[in-house]
């Protein structure tokens, strides 16, 4: 993140953040976003492109970009990297078959220059499903302990029940604000 970007954000009275939500298809990105925003989650279909939600939380204006995760759409992810303050990587904890794909795609993102400095929150979603991998198992599978380029945190959660969505988002906001906003 360049100095001008930091200065611009410090001057803004309205503390506005750009969050990018990515992950493989069917990980639960849209469900997390809708649940966090208090919307109905009964009928959610795959995101073919992207959704943008703007919501207020803890005095922040959050612009959350929810981008489809189908293999055919992943090459377009780079179009959304610019000015990203926080990256939310959503993992389907019950999808053991694709954990290696998930790890590879995350590693590809973390070397992107335009995401340098962005705080990383990993939501280990679908913890309510039988057979879901624990946060620690996902931490190992995704080799998270090797990440040195970003501040990161893994949070087990359930988009369906809403469990642990708030603590994850709160950690993300705390980390971002400690980096880019001056104390009031």
Swiss-Prot record:
Q: Where is the lipid attached (N-myristoyl glycine)?
A: 2
- The primary gene name is ARL2
Q: Which residues form a coiled coil?
A: none
Sorted alphabetically, the keyword list is: Cell cycle, Cytoplasm, Cytoskeleton, GTP-binding, Isopeptide bond, Lipoprotein, Mitochondrion, Myristate, Nucleotide-binding, Nucleus, Phosphoprotein, Ubl conjugation
Q: Report one GO cellular component.
A: mitochondrion
State where the record puts the cross-link Glycyl lysine isopeptide (Lys-Gly) (interchain with G-Cter in ubiquitin): 71
A GO biological-process term: centrosome cycle
Q: Which family does it belong to?
A: Belongs to the small GTPase superfamily. Arf family.
Q: Which residue ranges does UniProt annotate as crossing the membrane?
A: none
- GO molecular function terms attached to this record: GDP binding; GTP binding; GTPase activity
Q: Give the protein's biological function.
A: Small GTP-binding protein which cycles between an inactive GDP-bound and an active GTP-bound form, and the rate of cycling is regulated by guanine nucleotide exchange factors (GEF) and GTPase-activating proteins (GAP). GTP-binding protein that does not act as an allosteric activator of the cholera toxin catalytic subunit. Regulates formation of new microtubules and centrosome integrity. Prevents the TBCD-induced microtubule destruction. Participates in association with TBCD, in the disassembly of the apical junction complexes.
Which InterPro entries does the record match to this protein?
Arl2, ARL2/3, P-loop_NTPase, Small_GTP-bd, Small_GTPase_ARF/SAR
User: What protein name does the entry list?
Assistant: ADP-ribosylation factor-like protein 2
Q: What is the lineage of its organism?
A: Eukaryota, Metazoa, Chordata, Craniata, Vertebrata
């Amino acid at each position: 993140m360049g100095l001008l970007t930091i200065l611009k954000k410090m001057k803004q009275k309205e503390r506005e953040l750009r969050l990018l939500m990515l992950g493989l298809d069917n990980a639960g990105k849209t469900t997390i976003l809708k649940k966090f925003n208090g919307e109905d989650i009964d009928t959610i279909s795959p995101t073919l492109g992207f959704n943008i939600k703007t919501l207020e939380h803890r005095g922040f204006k959050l612009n959350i970009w929810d981008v489809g995760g189908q293999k055919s759409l992943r090459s377009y992810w780079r179009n959304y990297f610019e000015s990203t303050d926080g990256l939310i990587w959503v993992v389907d904890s019950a999808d053991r078959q694709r954990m290696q794909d998930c790890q590879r795609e995350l590693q590809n993102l973390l070397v992107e220059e335009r995401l340098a400095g962005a705080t990383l929150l990993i939501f280990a979603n679908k913890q309510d499903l039988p057979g879901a991998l624990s946060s620690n198992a996902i931490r190992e599978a995704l080799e998270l302990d090797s990440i040195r380029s970003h501040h990161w945190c893994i949070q087990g959660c359930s988009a369906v029940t809403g469990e642990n969505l708030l603590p994850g988002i709160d950690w993300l906001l705390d980390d971002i604000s400690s980096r880019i906003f001056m104390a009031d």
